[in-house]
């Protein structure tokens, strides 16, 4: 997900997106722990998307 797409969303939409990403991260971690995860790069992508969303939420709260 691109940061420019995230900047267009409201804070409520970003919080919803963040919850979805956190759930996805949890599921990926469980799959990784049980050896079912084949694309381990997904963990990295989700972690970075979480950071993007949190950064934009913080910048909107400060503005």
Curated annotation (Swiss-Prot):
Gene3D superfamilies, per database record: 1.10.287.310
Gene Ontology terms: cellular component: cytosolic large ribosomal subunit
Q: What is this protein called?
A: Large ribosomal subunit protein uL29
Keyword Hydrolase: yes or no? no
What GO terms are given for molecular function?
structural constituent of ribosome
One GO-annotated biological process of the protein? translation
**Pfam families, A to Z:** Ribosomal_L29
Q: Mind giving the lineage of the organism this protein is from? A: Bacteria, Pseudomonadati, Pseudomonadota, Gammaproteobacteria, Alteromonadales
Keywords, comma-separated and alphabetical: Ribonucleoprotein, Ribosomal protein
Which InterPro entries does this UniProt record tie to the protein? Answer: Ribosomal_protein_uL29 (IPR050063), Ribosomal_uL29 (IPR001854), Ribosomal_uL29_CS (IPR018254), Ribosomal_uL29_sf (IPR036049)
Family, similarity comment = Belongs to the universal ribosomal protein uL29 family.
